[in-house]
Amino acid sequence: MARQPEEEETAVARARRPPLWLLCLVACWLLGAGAEADFSILDEAQVLASQMRRLAAEELGVVTMQRIFNSFVYTEKISNGESEVQQLAKKIREKFNRYLDVVNRNKQVVEASYTAHLTSPLTAIQDCCTIPPSMMEFDGNFNTNVSRTISCDRLSTTVNSRAFNPGRDLNSVLADNLKSNPGIKWQYFSSEEGIFTVFPAHKFRCKGSYEHRSRPIYVSTVRPQSKHIVVILDHGASVTDTQLQIAKDAAQVILSAIDEHDKISVLTVADTVRTCSLDQCYKTFLSPATSETKRKMSTFVSSVKSSDSPTQHAVGFQKAFQLIRSTNNNTKFQANTDMVIIYLSAGITSKDSSEEDKKATLQVINEENSFLNNSVMILTYALMNDGVTGLKELAFLRDLAEQNSGKYGVPDRMALPVIKGSMMVLNQLSNLETTVGRFYTNLPNRMIDEAVFSLPFSDEMGDGLIMTVSKPCYFGNLLLGIVGVDVNLAYILEDVTYYQDSLASYTFLIDDKGYTLMHPSLTRPYLLSEPPLHTDIIHYENIPKFELVRQNILSLPLGSQIIAVPVNSSLSWHINKLRETGKEAYNVSYAWKMVQDTSFILCIVVIQPEIPVKQLKNLNTVPSSKLLYHRLDLLGQPSACLHFKQLATLESPTIMLSAGSFSSPYEHLSQPETKRMVEHYTAYLSDNTRLIANPGLKFSVRNEVMATSHVTDEWMTQMEMSSLNTYIVRRYIATPNGVLRIYPGSLMDKAFDPTRRQWYLHAVANPGLISLTGPYLDVGGAGYVVTISHTIHSSSTQLSSGHTVAVMGIDFTLRYFYKVLMDLLPVCNQDGGNKIRCFIMEDRGYLVAHPTLIDPKGHAPVEQQHITHKEPLVANDILNHPNFVKKNLCNSFSDRTVQRFYKFNTSLAGDLTNLVHGSHCSKYRLARIPGTNAFVGIVNETCDSLAFCACSMVDRLCLNCHRMEQNECECPCECPLEVNECTGNLTNAENRNPSCEVHQEPVTYTAIDPGLQDALHQCVNSRCSQRLESGDCFGVLDCEWCMVDSDGKTHLDKPYCAPQKECFGGIVGAKSPYVDDMGAIGDEVITLNMIKSAPVGPVAGGIMGCIMVLVLAVYAYRHQIHRRSHQHMSPLAAQEMSVRMSNLENDRDERDDDSHEDRGIISNTRFIAAVIERHAHSPERRRRYWGRSGTESDHGYSTMSPQEDSENPPCNNDPLSAGVDVGNHDEDLDLDTPPQTAALLSHKFHHYRSHHPTLHHSHHLQAAVTVHTVDAEC
């Protein structure tokens, strides 16, 4: 880049005399051009590439390992979707059959007990609320204290003392079921008389009665037919506040009693009729009662206020019938559907025209119902006014329910009889759950004795996601109640979740309506605590012609179909599975089968042409290698030590078998490992005789363990000989079946799955290339690390076309990468980093090395920092380069967002430089590092300049969700996913987006016994205190060069080297993110003192130059126009201000009045942006994005504009807490409600099970902006 000669400084000084300014400008330009001619970014990229290859070959052992895998003998396997889908469907059917057998067995016992009850009454009660704690103990399967020997009961208010209760007869049967069936959770019997019996017994926090008969599971089991329901709330002038509150509470109870198989609408009526405005489709159609629709309807009901106008009853019924009719016309009508209108009203008509109003209402009902063959039932609930009963009003409401139109002189239009409903009185003492919540008892009981399968929901009592299998119990025609079994979803879906046949195939499971239960885009059920959005499979498989495939899947019990898909309209994770990327189209093969005796359909998808899967033939273990399982805590390893926070050993690598290595992944995850089990694994895996029985591992796992053992000698040698050991955290190799070999050998969390980590996925997506990932916070305690990973292939002839049999990875400290940059590219350090900056970014635009990532006064978390965030000038320019970067969209259904992200072209030839004319303040060069997924860039900033990249400070919301331009600079961000609640379909624009790849899963640190921790020494002692020079300390394991005092601003007179925990990030006493997930010292305020005016000297000089030389006038004019174009991009342009980005998650910022040295490093991050004060918002809004578990962190969003904040105003209403909650056996549990984020509704970004507490502080930003608030009707 532009190396400035020493004479330049004096030339610049003389240039202040206007007559010489132009000469200086020309001279500088010529000198700069000459310097750039001497410098080649392509040569520097080659230097970096050589270093990367050396690291991969020497430190990681990629070349050696590939040579070893080339020598193995393989058997070839071609995927056959048709045969495999039948085998997999059979396994899933067997699981369901086990639970159906449990349900049928429990049903038989209940029905037999009732026969006995008739002669010898069974009425004994074991109240769940009074069980002594001594009878229970903690059970990991239920994640709470239970008794595995007895059941207990919860009672409704209406239960009489003689009610049938088979609970004690059931105990032995329920206990046997629990012992013999893995994955089983709660079992229960819910009686029609109001007794809820649950096993195992658990002590509830009881504040009142418990009405299980108004819960969705009970309702959908005793009335399995679909229900179309319209609820009308009367809020006219004659309805008092007390009556209106009763009506609102009753409507909430109805909402909580129905599920996704039903359709619902809520209307309010006074002089006009209103529908919920939170989705436009509610005005026209009924909507499936998903949790999202129920939440919106609940919000609408809560907002209803009394009206001053009289009630027009007829208008309400007219709209209700219209909704039902339009829904029937729009969808495939099912013959057994029950249609019901529920009217919550005082029944008062106007005094002047009472009879006319009544007649008009009955006439509307008569006419409209005749269009629907008199199939709609009307239920009316009379709202009492302080105990005073109006007989005329009650009679009117009864006539409405019974549709007595003849009484008012309205002739019947049809010969078909009407379905008479009922009228019930409600007052303040009414138990709404027992009355309104049981509205379904008016509907016909068709005595359908079939198992009902619920969709997945959260187990509020225990942990994880569950689904319920339930059946009704009858004695003759008498309904006794229902029996149900809650099944762990992770167990049911384990064969789908861990399906691993080849990289080119995957599987999904849907129900017979098309709802998706499991798909590769979704996180493993074991780690979820909230269900993903119930979404149709067509949105996951969003490729041309899939709609036809979907129709066939839902209509044919068995079949297969192949469709051709153009590459340019494909899914990103399909592209990753292709190996012949030159073709314009590829084939996708779908093979499916209905899982017998259930409502589920399994499908296997194969991307063609696929690479044949090569499986290792029987191998023997390396004689010199020792097989050591990772459970060092169970094995009592004498050579154990601490590798930062992890229990570890330097004696040899350890083997970790993740859940995917086991035939039953769920069983492995849910049961504790014992020493005996570990010994069995070790004996089997190291057995060359093949005589020891398999302890439940997949067939190919032993060969993978033995194959990876060949790397042991290489790593052990490097540990002794390598000069880079002080920078290397760990080395590891992982196989597709989840075998992980790691050195130093370390204790890992059993839920860890290497095949779902970013370093593994990046390597698989870039076969044969060196992939860079990070930086991210190492869960083992090593601070921020960067990973180099590389694939190992079965084929030796052409790396990129071989089947991937393993991925190798090595973790370096973050600062080591910047050290490499400084050492190999001297130009980066020639002016102390003040004007010339170097960086490395990977193919999604995230920075791996950059001055601000290692600067102690940058203060930002260094994860997920994007080039748009740190180098907005460069980002703005490279977006204009054709075919280099593409801004992509994808739909994320697990958190209901549209994600925006970048993908850079890794086949870039040559280098990139400034494209936009006039960008003289900032020159850059960018080139791909050959053989990697990364790019190296150099920026030479000769004067202050402004650029705009839209980045939110508080969350990940995009500035403008209504449009996305390829050449507009913005940080990776997200928008709410707009779904038509009535059809479940996406809006047309978002329907074109592919579904996102799976989210990165959090990694959990496995805690070890504190006593053991104190007794162990550190495996690696970096002797930080003995490192006296910055160069000896920089990037070394567990060491930090302490440069800044504890106030976060003052430079130390004598910097020194210390352990990381003493001055994390180079700041004395800074809190480690391992303590509280915050790297902050304290809250700080950005004031207007920090806002600098833009320089105007060059502009004045340009004008003078115009006067002197006509030829250069054009140049100066263009320069001036360019400067203004930058300034006009911001609301702050009038003040010529810029606010430097600040990362709020860390609650601190450096001042711009720091030393000249600091300004040089940081000044490149200046944006034009509007930053507003958001301390009034609840920290819940931030937690939706920042309160992540483990290492998952998405901290790269630093500038927010007020338009974004007002575009998505927050709703402060609490979501509807009553959903499908079989596991929630106490409505009074102290459960956390989901945080509210305006546009994202009640969905969290990740619903992970293990959550770490995160501190949240209020943030105060002050800048000269005007914010317009927007009121939202919630």
UniProtKB/Swiss-Prot annotation:
This is VWFA and cache domain-containing protein 1. The keyword Transmembrane applies. It is found in: Membrane. Its main location: membrane. Residues 1179-1227 are annotated as: Disordered. Glycans are attached at residue 145. Residues 453-532, 772-853 form the Cache domain. It comes from Homo sapiens (Human). The chain crosses the membrane at residues 1096-1116. Residues 1-35 form the signal peptide.
